[in-house]
């Protein structure tokens, strides 16, 4: 009987230690494309939470009170320069990494000049992503050095995938004869810079209603470049999108710059631009 108790006790200790789950680091990102990237590098060593989720527009996003406690628990925050991040700054106490810091930014772009001095859609460029995933890996190693080998390995794999992605996107758009793109919202400047397109934006930088002068400007752009399609964003209001299509008599092309799987999304954007 003593032997049986001893064996059961020993088994209990082994089982207990064997089932022990390492504590995951809590990592915060501002938008879901970076949730995807952090998870590709961190594997199951981190729990990643995106502040903006779903079809919400980060440019006019307001932080829901229910997220405040989750944000306070973060060990690390990857930020991108969006206006709503200023509110989050007052809540978080963890280390912050600005993923736009080492990027060749497009300054004073057509997107949101009222709030920002550069275009924040930096992830829509494989060249930018190669820089950003290095920053992600380094920051993860700093908070979880025991997983350094895993993070370096996964970062290296992502670098190779981004090289292949860049080649594939270049191949897709190489035969495109229309290099001018009319967009409702100026989200694609980095993609256009990388792959030889020119972005023409309908929306005003302060998100206000189009003036008669703006309408004349857009109509002139359509005539000058023989444009037949307009790129609309999935998170934009359906009424405003439909109004633009009717106003300018254009074929709508629906894209989502904030899709989580940024690799697949860049292929989707390339395919759409090639068919304009």
Curated annotation (Swiss-Prot):
Record Gene3D superfamilies: Nitrogenase molybdenum iron protein domain
Keyword Nucleotide-binding among record annotations: no
Binding site for a divalent metal cation: 59, 121, 185, 256
Pfam families assigned to the protein according to its UniProt record, in alphabetical order: ZnuA (PF01297)
A biological process term (GO) from this entry: metal ion transport
Taxonomic superkingdom: Bacteria
Signal peptide: 1-18
Any single Gene Ontology cellular-component annotation: periplasmic space
Ribosomal protein found in the keyword field: no
Compartmental location: Periplasm
Keywords: Metal-binding, Periplasm, Signal, Transport
GO molecular function terms noted in the UniProt entry: metal ion binding
The family this protein is said to belong to: Belongs to the bacterial solute-binding protein 9 family.
Function: Part of an ATP-binding cassette (ABC) transport system involved in metal import. Binds a metal with high affinity and specificity and delivers it to the membrane permease for translocation into the cytoplasm.
PANTHER family: HIGH-AFFINITY ZINC UPTAKE SYSTEM PROTEIN ZNUA, HIGH-AFFINITY ZINC UPTAKE SYSTEM PROTEIN ZNUA-RELATED
Protein name as it appears in the record: Putative metal-binding protein TC_0696
Organism: Chlamydia muridarum (strain MoPn / Nigg)
UniProt lineage: Bacteria, Pseudomonadati, Chlamydiota, Chlamydiia, Chlamydiales
């Amino acid at each position: 009987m003593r032997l049986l108790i001893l064996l059961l006790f020993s088994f209990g200790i082994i089982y207990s230690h064997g089932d022990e789950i390492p504590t995951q680091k809590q990592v915060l990102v501002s938008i879901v494309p970076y949730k995807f990237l952090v998870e590709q590098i961190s594997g199951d060593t981190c729990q990643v939470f995106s502040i903006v989720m779903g079809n919400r527009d980060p440019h006019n996003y307001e932080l829901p009170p229910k997220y405040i406690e989750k944000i306070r628990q973060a060990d690390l925050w990857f930020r991108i320069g969006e206006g709503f991040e200023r509110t989050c700054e007052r809540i978080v106490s963890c280390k912050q990494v600005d993923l736009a810091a080492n990027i060749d930014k497009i300054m004073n772009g057509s997107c949101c000049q009222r709030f920002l001095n550069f275009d924040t859609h930096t992830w829509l460029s494989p060249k930018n992503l190669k820089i950003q995933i290095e920053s992600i890996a380094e920051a993860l190693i700093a908070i979880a050095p025991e997983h350094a080998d895993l993070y370096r390995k996964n970062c290296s794999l992502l670098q190779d995938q981004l090289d292949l992605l860049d080649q594939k996107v270049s191949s897709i758009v190489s035969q495109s004869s229309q290099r001018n793109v009319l967009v409702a919202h100026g989200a694609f400047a980095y993609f256009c810079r990388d792959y030889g397109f020119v972005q023409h934006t309908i929306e005003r930088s302060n998100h206000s209603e189009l003036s008669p002068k703006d309408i004349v400007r857009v109509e002139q752009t359509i005539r000058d470049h023989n444009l037949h399609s307009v790129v609309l964003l999935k998170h934009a209001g359906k009424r405003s999108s439909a109004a633009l299509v009717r106003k300018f008599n254009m074929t709508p092309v629906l894209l989502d710059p904030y899709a989580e799987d940024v690799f697949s999304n860049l292929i989707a954007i390339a395919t759409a631009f090639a068919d304009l």
